[in-house]
């Protein structure tokens, strides 16, 4: 089973990307959030992969820029009525920490923003994810009712972490330096500023 691919971005389509690994091209199905964060064609990337078998389609590779996203995808698919397409749709509108926060505050409306996810399915997702692992990230930082100040918007943090991982930096280290940069720069920090500050902290 394929768990990760490191290679060059050969093509990027509307629903998938072609990753060239030592001359072998892998078609990887991705959500729009992931596709928009991929490096330019010809540049190297690391894709975390989940293999899904379908009777009609055979094996399909689903790709994510972080282990956290792949873990959330796998967890979402344990819910009745949530297939790969719906799981990707949810992760397109809610990064794992945002999804965990929505579940914590029982915000089914946030989940229902996903394409193809109606109110009933959104309610089921919120209920069934209560006791399941979704994110390793600091969920409280993105909780609407958190008592601690929000250090950074999750979209900016996610983009910055993904960019650092694309440079070969391990996810835990990338998260640590991005969170540190966010605390210094404030909650309005944008991805480029976070990335620059994080790289400076790493001495690059």
Swiss-Prot record:
Keywords of this entry: Cytoplasm, DNA damage, DNA recombination, DNA repair, DNA-binding
InterPro entries named among the record's database cross-references: DNA_helicase_Holl-junc_RuvA_I, NA-bd_OB-fold, RuvA, RuvA_2-like, RuvA_C, RuvA_C_sf
Region (Flexible linker): 145-155
Disulfide-linked positions: none
Annotated spans, Domain II: 66-144
GO molecular function annotations of the record: ATP binding; four-way junction DNA binding; four-way junction helicase activity
Region (Domain III): 155-204
Gene Ontology biological process terms in this record: DNA recombination; DNA repair
Top-level taxon in the UniProt lineage: Bacteria
Annotated localization: Cytoplasm
Entries under CDD domains matching the protein: UBA_RuvA_C (cd14332)
Region described as Domain I: spans on this chain: 1-65
GO cellular component: cytoplasm; Holliday junction helicase complex; Holliday junction resolvase complex
Quaternary structure note: Homotetramer. Forms an RuvA(8)-RuvB(12)-Holliday junction (HJ) complex. HJ DNA is sandwiched between 2 RuvA tetramers; dsDNA enters through RuvA and exits via RuvB. An RuvB hexamer assembles on each DNA strand where it exits the tetramer. Each RuvB hexamer is contacted by two RuvA subunits (via domain III) on 2 adjacent RuvB subunits; this complex drives branch migration. In the full resolvosome a probable DNA-RuvA(4)-RuvB(12)-RuvC(2) complex forms which resolves the HJ.
Function of the protein: The RuvA-RuvB-RuvC complex processes Holliday junction (HJ) DNA during genetic recombination and DNA repair, while the RuvA-RuvB complex plays an important role in the rescue of blocked DNA replication forks via replication fork reversal (RFR). RuvA specifically binds to HJ cruciform DNA, conferring on it an open structure. The RuvB hexamer acts as an ATP-dependent pump, pulling dsDNA into and through the RuvAB complex. HJ branch migration allows RuvC to scan DNA until it finds its consensus sequence, where it cleaves and resolves the cruciform DNA.
Domain note: Has three domains with a flexible linker between the domains II and III and assumes an 'L' shape. Domain III is highly mobile and contacts RuvB.
Annotated family: Belongs to the RuvA family.
Protein name, as recorded: Holliday junction branch migration complex subunit RuvA
Taxonomic source organism: Phenylobacterium zucineum (strain HLK1)
Gene name, Swiss-Prot/TrEMBL: ruvA
